[in-house]
Amino acid sequence: MDSPSPENPSGTESPNPKSPQTTGTRLSHRPASRQKPALDSNTRSAPIPDDEHGADLPITMSASVVLSSLPRDAHRALADAEAVDTGKVTVRFQPLPSAPILKNRVFKISASQKFETVVKFLRKKLDCKDTDSVFCYVNSVFAPGLDEGVGGLWRCFKTDDQLIVSYSMTPAFG
């Protein structure tokens, strides 16, 4: 290891130990100093003081409301969201390998129904016993929860305006 010399007190930690250290001269390839210039007391910015908030001041709900009414766009968006779940949704059942095939694969269901209704309907069409298992997957990708809305699934995962539900009697995907 090199020992620090009087010309180069930093020793080997310097990026270029063999070049003499320049004092007072700024080279164009070196970054500027990170020290902030001294400011006058007139130009120095003071920190913004924190407001004193009393935790004991009761605030009513009406005082905390920012908007008195919803904007028109929000009303329209809410109306559109409610309208989606009022119609009918087309569901196409796709059998996975080793699953029984339905004679009619396309059915309509109310968009406001839960996915549980789809599974119960499929079990009835397949003449399943209470002990038989049916595994359903949307677009052969994921198994939705039984409490998921059919309208929301259709809106997010539809293919050619149909909700594709693949089914199997054994687990098909990990």
Curated annotation (Swiss-Prot):
Gene3D superfamilies annotated for this entry?
A: Phosphatidylinositol 3-kinase Catalytic Subunit, Chain A, domain 1
Domain of life, per lineage: Eukaryota
| CC annotations in GO | Atg12-Atg5-Atg16 complex; autophagosome membrane; phagophore assembly site membrane
Q: Quaternary structure? A: Forms a conjugate with atg5.
UniProt biased composition (Polar residues): 8-26
Q: Which organism is it from?
A: Aspergillus fumigatus (strain ATCC MYA-4609 / CBS 101355 / FGSC A1100 / Af293) (Neosartorya fumigata)
Where, subcellularly, is it found?
Preautophagosomal structure membrane
Chief subcellular site?
A: membrane
Entry protein name? Ubiquitin-like protein ATG12
Report keywords, A-Z: Autophagy, Isopeptide bond, Membrane, Protein transport, Transport, Ubl conjugation pathway
- Choose any GO biological process term that the UniProt entry carries and state it: piecemeal microautophagy of the nucleus
The task this protein performs is described as: Ubiquitin-like protein involved in cytoplasm to vacuole transport (Cvt), autophagy vesicles formation, mitophagy, and nucleophagy. Conjugation with atg5 through a ubiquitin-like conjugating system involving also atg7 as an E1-like activating enzyme and atg10 as an E2-like conjugating enzyme, is essential for its function. The atg12-atg5 conjugate functions as an E3-like enzyme which is required for lipidation of atg8 and atg8 association to the vesicle membranes.
- MF GO annotations: protein tag activity
